[in-house]
Amino acid sequence: MRFLIILFLIFQSNLVKAFEINGEIIQGALIIGKEQPGKSIYINKQKIKLSKNGIFVFGINYNQTGNVIIESVDKNNQITSKTYKIKKRQYKIQKIDGLHEKMVTPDQKALEIIKKENDLIKNAQLINSDFEFFLSGFSKPIDGVISGVYGSQRILNGKPRSPHLGIDFAAPKGTEVKSPADGYVTLAEKSFYFTGGSIILDHGHGVSTIYAHLDEILVRKDELIKKGQVIGKVGSTGRATGPHLHFGVNWFDAKIDPELIFN
């Protein structure tokens, strides 16, 4: 009997503890997970970074449907798997008039400029650093009124355009924009065609934030930023009808709803 009890206790101590996740599996969500260090984590067969402390993070794109399958693989190739159904959302329609026509239907020369700028933005958002700044949570970059919501279908001068994949804060020109978390500056540009004055901060593991239409940029590329540090000032540069801050969140190329990550 004593042998059986000892054997049972040994078995219990060797049970594989399943990974844990924090967050609702819904379009636009950023999900943080915890697993035993040394394992491998896969999201829908894509291997993602697992920190030395067993932390992982992934995002769900605005239009992603179906399931999220999370697999944890140990050194003996034993797999623990869980499947989650993605909750779909209904998005609003937003009409914006009064834009200069070149900002709605750019000419060929402008399209070439836009492509180069979009490549710079994409490259900055695909960085997979070891930072874990995202773990501290995110505060709002300014206290302005939200004038544009995530996921809304944009109708610009009566013409359907891409969804709005961030949120807009209406605020007076010159309002200070503060970093919502510690970060590393991967892009700081004064005059992009659509986004105007633009900053991208890397928060680690593919999580990044973008700040657009800035009147002033107060940081430099490759600079480490502290949470609450002033990084720029609100403007109306690029494609904008008035002063506001466009704030976006990415997990690599997945667009995350900023309102789901605050605090």
Give, region by region, the residue ranges found by the protein language model.
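Cleavable N-terminal signal peptides
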Residues: 5-6, 15-16, 151
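Surface-exposed, glycine-biased beta-strand/turn segments
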Residues: 83-195
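Short peripheral tails and domain-boundary helices/loops at the edges of structured domains
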Residues: 251-263
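Zn2+-dependent peptidoglycan hydrolase active-site motif and core
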Residues: 180-215, 243, 248
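Short hydrophobic beta/alpha edge segments that flank linear recognition/processing sites
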Residues: 169, 198-199, 226-238
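Short, well-structured beta-strand-loop connectors
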Residues: 176-187, 219-234
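Cationic-aromatic interfacial patches
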Residues: 17-90
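Sec-dependent N-terminal signal peptides
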Residues: 3-12, 70
